[in-house]
Amino acid sequence: MIADLIQRPLLTYTLLLPRFMACFVILPVLSKQLLGGVLLRNGIVCSLALYVYPAVANQPYIEVDAFTLMLLIGKEIILGLLIGFVATIPFWALESAGFIVDNQRGAAMASLLNPGLDSQTSPTGLLLTQTLITIFFSGGAFLSLLSALFHSYVNWPVASFFPAVSEQWVDFFYNQFSQILLIAAVLAAPLLIAMFLAEFGLALISRFAPSLNVFVLAMPIKSAIASLLLVIYCMQMMSHASKAMLLVMDPISLLIPVLEK
């Protein structure tokens, strides 16, 4: 009798949890390196999933066998990965912008481990990513992401299987990859232009004074220019990145067309 009473709540919670778990596995904001362990991250995600339980519990209940249960869990994992992929685009773009800047100034060999994205990155890429994570929590993007996840259980219920995959899906994800390159290029462009002008000036000096080995000073000069401009430009860069992040986290832009059935 008691087992029958807890069977449906446990099954409902088991089915709604993989979408949350898969989404936050990709997102750098709750990575195991930042939190110090997987158990802490899983505990936070399980706690957040409790808020959407009433909405999922009110949806039509279906009897499922073991095979159907595995299919539903697999669908939830894939859907969570898709949402997490779209939500992580601003972080990847900003890390790419920092790597492009460091590569241009000749410091790409100084690679560091990015604890958020769990990948090797440059010092500037790590700085920008960590700054964006701070803005993610302080600027309201975390609440927008939770709102998008909560809406996803309404747009695509747990008991519903895969929708028809059309060309709209292909165009959508192609545009997301293009968005990564576009944001990275736009954010890094001012610093790249300044370093190019500095290197062009050194090339002119070397042309008119061949005896001077000015390119020995190329890396320190470009690094100084990039550091100085980054202090001035960082506020504008973070403002643009946070706007792009809030746009991505918006439930409508995040869930359409991914969650349209």
Curated annotation (Swiss-Prot):
Q: Which residues cross the membrane?
A: 20-40, 44-64, 77-97, 131-151, 180-200, 214-234, 239-259
What GO biological process terms does the UniProt entry carry, in alphabetical order?
Answer: protein targeting; protein transport
Q: Tell me where in or outside the cell this protein is found.
A: Cell membrane
Query: What is one cellular component GO term in this UniProt entry?
Result: plasma membrane
Keywords assigned by UniProt, alphabetized: Cell membrane, Membrane, Plasmid, Protein transport, Transmembrane, Transmembrane helix, Transport, Virulence
Task: Specify the domain of life of the species encoding this protein.
Answer: Bacteria
| Membrane topology according to the record | Multi-pass membrane protein
InterPro entries given for it?
T3SS_IM_R, T3SS_SpaR/YscT
Against PANTHER family, the record matches this protein to: FLAGELLAR BIOSYNTHETIC PROTEIN FLIR (PTHR30065), SURFACE PRESENTATION OF ANTIGENS PROTEIN SPAR (PTHR30065:SF1)
- What family, per the record? Belongs to the FliR/MopE/SpaR family.
Q: What does this protein do?
A: Component of the yop secretion machinery.
Could you tell me what this protein is called?
A: Yop proteins translocation protein T
Q: Which organism is it from?
A: Yersinia pestis
